[in-house]
């Protein structure tokens, strides 16, 4: 599309919302557009992702906490809507793009009031609350998966499968081969627990790796993300087992570490699944059972069905089960390489381009293209989804 435009991205302040918003911001600016971000207080803690982007904090509210909590949430949402309307008078966006999370709600409500074109992007395989509420009124819906539970059938005509955008540093891994692996070479495992780590991984993974056969355990080199309170205990466990391990609470170079890894052990957040697919890395996934609408189980199903990952329910996640699954995947180097290739097949390396194309079309008032109304794969996969 010719001509520079302005776009507003609205996202909740967690990594699952902020990372795809960041990727789209970079792509839109690469195309010569101007971008502003609307988020909550949590979202302002990601300054490294939005160095060249205006960041505006809106009041928003969670629709919980009984009558009193609901009343306060509605007041905050209304205040956020009014503040967003003022922002739109000065910034004049061609479109407003919502990535879910409560801060996206007042931003999109203001866009409806101002008659600004709107797009929502759903990162998970289950439509989130905010996006479900907005889906009927937006101009277009972008999804990360063909099968999205709780996406109503009547919205298919305006829905496109774009995939989940990932950072440029992860896209770089797409063209790199799977790291060389033999029966005697170093076997690198990356353990990540989402944006804040996961204590259960710190409890189970070191002990599970310690149960592996000696000839396999001697080859291990571990990189693990931990919560701050688990850091020293986890380091001590690995030291006791004699397993080289780099333990930290935050990994600024996570894409590079992903590129070195032969196997990933992680939760099944949307960004993690997207990065595994783009990079082509096999994984053992432990979905977070308390995730809203159990969406991490749904996120994992495509990668698991393709043979790129194994899933362990958290109720069965113990050192013995982990050691068993690692041995099934790792005793033959060719098995891990095959799993990596299968993971790569379900990646969406062009997700950010597809999403940016959609946003430009909607922002330019151009006809919608490539909807999934007649997509037979989508039709088949949506059977059984909640309507």
From Swiss-Prot:
> Where is it predominantly found?
membrane
PANTHER family the record matches = GLYCOSYLTRANSFERASE, UDP-N-ACETYLGLUCOSAMINE--N-ACETYLMURAMYL-(PENTAPEPTIDE) PYROPHOSPHORYL-UNDECAPRENOL N-ACETYLGLUCOSAMINE TRANSFERASE 1
Specify the protein name.
UDP-N-acetylglucosamine--N-acetylmuramyl-(pentapeptide) pyrophosphoryl-undecaprenol N-acetylglucosamine transferase
**Does this UniProt record's set of keywords contain Transcription?**
no
Region named Disordered: 366-387
Listed binding positions for UDP-N-acetyl-alpha-D-glucosamine are 14-16, 124, 167, 195, 296
Highest taxon listed in the record's lineage: Bacteria
Catalytic reaction(s) noted: di-trans,octa-cis-undecaprenyl diphospho-N-acetyl-alpha-D-muramoyl-L-alanyl-D-glutamyl-meso-2,6-diaminopimeloyl-D-alanyl-D-alanine + UDP-N-acetyl-alpha-D-glucosamine = di-trans,octa-cis-undecaprenyl diphospho-[N-acetyl-alpha-D-glucosaminyl-(1->4)]-N-acetyl-alpha-D-muramoyl-L-alanyl-D-glutamyl-meso-2,6-diaminopimeloyl-D-alanyl-D-alanine + UDP + H(+)
Q: What is its EC number?
A: 2.4.1.227
Q: Which keywords has UniProt assigned to this entry?
A: Cell cycle, Cell division, Cell inner membrane, Cell membrane, Cell shape, Cell wall biogenesis/degradation, Glycosyltransferase, Membrane, Peptidoglycan synthesis, Transferase
Q: Where is this chain's protein located in or outside the cell? A: Cell inner membrane
What membrane topology was assigned to this protein in its record?
A: Peripheral membrane protein
Q: Name one GO cellular component term.
A: plasma membrane
What is the main EC category here? transferase
Organism equals Zymomonas mobilis subsp. mobilis (strain ATCC 31821 / ZM4 / CP4)
**Which Gene Ontology MF annotations are present?**
UDP-N-acetyl-D-glucosamine:N-acetylmuramoyl-L-alanyl-D-glutamyl-meso-2,6-diaminopimelyl-D-alanyl-D-alanine-diphosphoundecaprenol 4-beta-N-acetylglucosaminlytransferase activity; undecaprenyldiphospho-muramoylpentapeptide beta-N-acetylglucosaminyltransferase activity
Q: Which GO terms describe its biological process?
A: carbohydrate metabolic process; cell division; cell wall organization; lipid glycosylation; peptidoglycan biosynthetic process; regulation of cell shape
- Gene name, per UniProt, is murG
Specify the pathway. Cell wall biogenesis; peptidoglycan biosynthesis
Q: Which family does it belong to?
A: Belongs to the glycosyltransferase 28 family. MurG subfamily.
Q: Where is the composition biased (Basic and acidic residues)?
A: 377-387
Q: Which InterPro entries match?
A: GlcNAc_MurG (IPR006009), Glyco_trans_28_C (IPR007235), GlycoTrans_28_N (IPR004276)
The entry's function note states: Cell wall formation. Catalyzes the transfer of a GlcNAc subunit on undecaprenyl-pyrophosphoryl-MurNAc-pentapeptide (lipid intermediate I) to form undecaprenyl-pyrophosphoryl-MurNAc-(pentapeptide)GlcNAc (lipid intermediate II).
